[in-house]
């Protein structure tokens, strides 16, 4: 159960041999391969050039994965051109993968899902240790604003992670103008994706209209401030997740019938934010269910607003308070 809770919290399992802190991720082994997610645009082309220069000096190899989404005429030629640029820079291996973008989930989300599936496939095929993506500080600021508009809590304002363990984003501290200037100074010819100027896409409207207005009305530095906010929220979120994991491991017990229980007294002693995280963590780890905020608050009411309520039936799980325990049963 300990490992399942840690996995659900997206945290490393504590190191039983050390100082009880999280185990440190292993560095890249000598000769390890990293793949650049290359579109041919200025950001990814600059990253490809940087990797081609730095990788041999750091003792690892660099290749590229070019994903052809097939969403516009000439996409195969664009992908082939990006692959040629990667090879000219000295990257290898260079893979080109054509993907099918499903209609479900919106065009941006569907394209991203297809792209990441291709990344996974390329990593398996080449035994690559990491995939490097060229998202910039501008991309991060846009992501934070989009999360703010969704209003789905602090997690939606954390932006993109610099390091997920599989994906690395080394350019999150750089502005987009820097990568374009680098390409110009280096004689590299990036491809400009027409979709990046299409206002049909929400992110394009944020980029071309919302951020410029904020900079104009509030002064320069808005993008940097949004990126700093995301970083601070990630730090806070990791701390709260660690506390939630520790609390869950202290309060949880498991029965032979598949149910899981939490001690009510221990949950009630903590602040609401931590209590709700523990509830979400346990339900996610044990039942694979992601509780919405309204469902989480309904469960928390069995602790903080207890007046003899009956069982609570939620998607995938049934919750009962009895004998000082909050017990979660899987729906059968």
From Swiss-Prot:
Its EC number is 6.3.4.19. One of its GO terms (biological process) is tRNA modification. Its main location: cytoplasm. One of its GO terms (cellular component) is cytoplasm. Gene3D superfamilies: 1.20.59.20, HUPs. ATP binds at residues 39-44. It is found in: Cytoplasm. SUPFAM superfamilies: Adenine nucleotide alpha hydrolases-like, MesJ substrate recognition domain-like. It holds the Pfam family ATP_bind_3. It is an enzyme of class 6 (ligase). Ligates lysine onto the cytidine present at position 34 of the AUA codon-specific tRNA(Ile) that contains the anticodon CAU, in an ATP-dependent manner. Cytidine is converted to lysidine, thus changing the amino acid specificity of the tRNA from methionine to isoleucine. This is tRNA(Ile)-lysidine synthase.
């Amino acid at each position: 159960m300990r490992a399942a809770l840690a996995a659900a919290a997206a945290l490393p399992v504590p190191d039983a041999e050390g100082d009880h802190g999280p185990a440190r991720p292993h560095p890249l082994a000598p000769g390890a391969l990293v793949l650049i997610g290359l579109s041919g645009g200025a950001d990814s082309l600059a990253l490809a050039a940087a990797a081609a220069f730095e990788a041999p000096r750091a003792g690892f190899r660099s290749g590229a994965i070019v994903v052809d989404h097939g969403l516009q005429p000439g996409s195969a030629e664009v992908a082939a051109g990006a692959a040629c640029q990667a090879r000219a820079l000295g990257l290898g291996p260079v893979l080109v993968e054509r993907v099918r973008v499903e209609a479900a989930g919106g065009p941006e989300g569907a394209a991203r899902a297809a792209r990441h599936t291709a990344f996974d496939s390329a990593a398996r095929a080449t035994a690559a240790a990491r995939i490097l993506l060229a998202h910039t500080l501008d991309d991060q600021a846009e992501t934070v604003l989009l999360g703010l508009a969704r209003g789905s809590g602090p997690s939606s304002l954390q932006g993109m992670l610099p390091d997920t363990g599989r994906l690395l984003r080394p350019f999150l501290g750089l502005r987009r103008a820097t990568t374009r200037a680098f390409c110009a100074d280096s004689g590299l010819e990036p491809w400009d994706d027409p979709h990046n100027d299409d206002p049909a896409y929400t992110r394009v409207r944020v980029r071309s209209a919302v951020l410029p207005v904020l900079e104009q009305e509030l002064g320069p530095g808005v993008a940097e401030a949004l990126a700093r906010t995301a970083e601070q929220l990630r730090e806070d979120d990791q701390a709260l997740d660690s506390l939630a994991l520790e609390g869950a491991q202290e309060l949880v017990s498991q029965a032979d019938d598949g149910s899981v229980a939490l001690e009510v007294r221990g949950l009630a002693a903590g602040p609401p934010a931590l209590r709700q995280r523990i509830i979400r963590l346990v339900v996610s780890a044990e039942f694979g269910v992601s509780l919405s905020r309204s469902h989480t608050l309904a469960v928390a009411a069995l602790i903080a607003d207890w007046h003899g309520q009956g069982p609570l039936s939620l998607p995938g799980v049934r919750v009962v308070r009895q004998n000082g325990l909050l017990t979660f049963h899987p729906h059968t």
